[in-house]
Amino acid sequence: MNRRELFAALAATAVVGDALAMAQPTTVMGSHVFDWNSLTDVPNQHGSTRTVCSTPTATLENLEIHVSTLKPGVSPHPPHRHPNEELIIIRQGTVETLSNGTWIRVGPGSIIFNGSNQLHGFKNVGTENAIYHVVNVKTEKTPAGGTVFG
């Protein structure tokens, strides 16, 4: 095979690869029920996490939901920011959350919204495990980038 034939073969492979990639539909989650008993509780150094889903929907590039259990006196990570917006619903325990530069203490039933690229943090300041539901959303308007600590 000479250089011209090699180049033509590589170009054809690239075109076919692109066409196949574009033809692969992204599975979009429709209405769904998640049975609590079917969610695996995975222990970690801070407590545990149950992953509910991380998938595209009809209107979101990604919907990520998990439920975390956080041991008393523990923070899952240092204050940080990320492009996606995040909603946290406290089910059990007392936590402090960093919001708009201020640490605020909240308990069961409280709802925390962390805006895109806004510095936020979280720690369990109670004497029992804190359990909370986290909903992260990514849309076409979500800025590019990843998590930045500090």
Where are these regions (language model features)?
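Ligand-binding loop in jelly-roll beta-barrel domains
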Residues: 60, 116-141
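Histidine-centered metal-chelating micro-motifs
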Residues: 75-77, 96, 112, 116-122
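Short acidic-glycine-tyrosine-enriched beta hairpin
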Residues: 102-116
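A short, N-terminal "cap"/entry segment at the start of jelly-roll beta-barrel domains
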Residues: 3, 7-62, 143-150
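Short, conserved beta-strand element in jelly-roll/cupin
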Residues: 69-70, 81-97
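Aromatic/pi-system hotspot detector in well-structured domains
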Residues: 63-66, 82, 111, 132
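Conserved short histidine dyad/triad with adjacent acidic residue
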Residues: 51, 66-81
